[in-house]
Amino acid sequence: MEKKNYIVAIDLGSSNVVVAVAERDAEGRPAVRSIVSKPSQGVKAGMITNIEQVSNSIKAAVEAVGEELGIRITEAYTGISGDFVRCARHTDHVFTSDPQNGVNRTDVEALFDRMRNVQAPDDETIMERIPQNYLVDENQEVADPVGSFGKRLASTFNFILCAKTPIERLNLALRRLGIRSLGMYANALVTGAAVLSADEKEEGAAVVNIGGGVTDVA
């Protein structure tokens, strides 16, 4: 597979495994070239229960799209869903470095650094850290704090966590097929980002994705 041209995504569900391949144009913009869906076995409610069946299911979909496009898939992005994926919120703050001249990017990065230091429980991993809001001096909520005047910058982050076991099992299935995982994402988060506009997110719209064993709400 020509790494510079193709982007591959694998979505392993309880009833189907879907492989999508996009090709980058000269300006780096992706365009979908192929989407293949095959029945999946060995998955229950998003959790891999039989590694042999799952490997064979992924292999069937990967080989089908590979034959169609004349490529060999060796790396891919993957999605994951199940009741082992959850959200948790954490609020923290920093004091601004130069209150007279307003909040700067360094202050925001310092706040992000504090959030990066938040640790997940031993049996979970943090998949995403997403700022929900910013609060300047505890009374001024802003979407982008840079330039706002204040001594204290706070934020509440939404943490997307996933149990380690399903991640390890999915990575094992990929390794058995010689596929390197480029990144793993919560399906609900990716679906919401792809389908909802910025205004819809602000207004509280939701996307409901009903699968064979898992229903995601974003």
Task: Give the label of every model feature segment.
Residues E203-A218:
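Glycine-rich phosphate-binding loop of actin/hexokinase-like ATP-binding domains
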Residues M1-N16, A20-V207:
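Nucleotide/phosphate-binding catalytic cleft detector across ATP-hydrolyzing
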